């Protein structure tokens, strides 16, 4: 792993002093440089692939980071072999609150560091630390609940950055209320490291939770420090329609990672209808419209990643 150490480098965060000596400054700079100059290919999902493993339907994805690290690393290696330049840690639901809800015993820091170590086994060009929404209701900013979400996000962000990720990815954001304390917590820990934000939208381009259009969501995220904005876990149609709208609005690099559509319940569990060729055709449009990073989300596999790599001529 590429680690940039600055002796005694500390900053005062909302919870006091944090040691940022192990933050991967060079990796963060490279991530932003390449987002500004290339169309990068990100890996596909971790959760839906892990859930499809034999007998794993009821096992929280974060559990695998320490219990079966070789399985997590194998999935990352498949994506890297398919052409993914950006890997994403298996930490979407690995905040302290989420781990408590899933009754996962190891500490939040151990689970997140394990996920980074698992991904590093695939020798990624770039590595993003995934952060998902935190399921705590809050009503007033600076309330006890708001501060709890912010603290959870800050602690997870710090764990990921200290483990050596090149940047943070706050993804599948369904509302501004969903985003606000998580983004604040991520920035509490980031100390200048990149924080990317990705929204979940419907086919009209509106956020799934509060109905805000993608333009408004982008303006909010950028105003509050997002270094990149995008969409994920939406339909292919929604993603393709959203890219030019996002590029026209954003002042930061735009990302796009749709899913494979709605799964179908079968005797063997949930099954997605993966269509790599459709993703490859759409990818040409995303790149032409100005997307800085493309990829795929729930229901896809390394087969779709390979099709996207072919479309990008990687």
PLM regions and their residue ranges:
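N-terminal amphipathic/basic-hydrophobic helices that include classical n-h-c signal peptides
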Residues: 1-22
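Domain-level signal for soluble alpha/beta catalytic cores
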Residues: 16-314
């Amino acid at each position: 792993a590429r680690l940039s150490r600055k002796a005694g480098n500390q900053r005062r965060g909302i919870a006091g002093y944090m040691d940022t000596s192990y933050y991967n400054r060079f990796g963060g700079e490279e991530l932003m440089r390449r987002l500004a100059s290339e169309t990068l290919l990100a890996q596909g999902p971790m959760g839906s692939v892990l859930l499809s493993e034999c007998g794993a339907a009821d096992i929280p994805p974060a559990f695998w980071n320490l219990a079966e690290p070789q399985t997590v690393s194998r999935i990352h290696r498949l994506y890297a072999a398919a052409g993914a330049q950006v890997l994403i840690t298996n930490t979407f639901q690995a905040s302290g609150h989420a781990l408590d809800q899933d009754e996962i015993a190891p500490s939040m820091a151990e689970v997140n560091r394990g996920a980074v170590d698992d991904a590093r086994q695939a020798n990624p060009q770039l590595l993003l630390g995934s952060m998902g929404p935190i399921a705590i209701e809050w009503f007033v900013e600076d309330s006890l609940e708001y501060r709890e979400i912010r603290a959870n996000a800050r602690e997870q962000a710090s764990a990921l950055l200290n483990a050596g990720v090149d940047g943070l990815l706050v993804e599948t954001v369904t509302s501004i209320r969903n985003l606000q304390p998580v983004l604040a917590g991520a920035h509490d820990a980031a100390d200048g490291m990149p924080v990317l934000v990705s929204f979940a939208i419907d086919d009209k381009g509106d956020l799934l939770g509060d109905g805000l259009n993608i333009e408004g969501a982008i303006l909010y995220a950028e105003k509050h420090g997002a270094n990149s904005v995008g969409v994920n876990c939406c339909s292919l149609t929604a993603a393709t329609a959203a890219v030019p709208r996002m590029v026209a609005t954003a002042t930061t690099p735009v990302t796009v990672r749709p899913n494979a559509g709605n799964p179908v319940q079968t005797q063997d569990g949930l099954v997605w209808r993966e269509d790599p060729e459709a993703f490859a055709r759409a990818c040409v449009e995303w790149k032409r419209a100005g997307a800085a990073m493309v990829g795929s989300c729930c229901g896809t596999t390394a087969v779709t990643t390979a099709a996207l790599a072919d479309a990008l001529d990687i």
